[in-house]
Amino acid sequence: MKKNVLITLLAALLLSSCGEYNKLLKSTDYEYKYEAAKNYFAKGQYSRAATLLNELIAILKGTDKAEESLYMLGMSYYNQKDYQTAAQTFTQYYNVYPRGTFTELARFHAGK
């Protein structure tokens, strides 16, 4: 009995978290998406972070969040072991932000 209740609660929790993520993907609240991407990144959910950040890069261009977003996108790919895409993203980062906060780290991760 207790086992069935526990399984039901766990399934409901998993389904609700997937539902929240899907709502987030459809949302036009880019500030909320940015904060969610940072949270996913901090929790090690790099695939979800990369999906959100990939969408936000063009939208955040020219803002104070653009630099950090591009670096987090590169690190998300890197942490998923997608080294080729990570290197391309890091190269883009240090070309766009040659004196940026993360330029040295981006060059390191790009192998430059």
For every predicted segment, state its role.
Residues 19-22:
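Bacterial signal peptide processing site
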Residues 24-26, 58-66, 94-103:
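Short solvent-exposed coil/turn linkers within tandem alpha-helical repeat scaffolds
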Residues 15-17:
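C-terminal motif of bacterial Sec signal peptides marking the signal peptidase cleavage site
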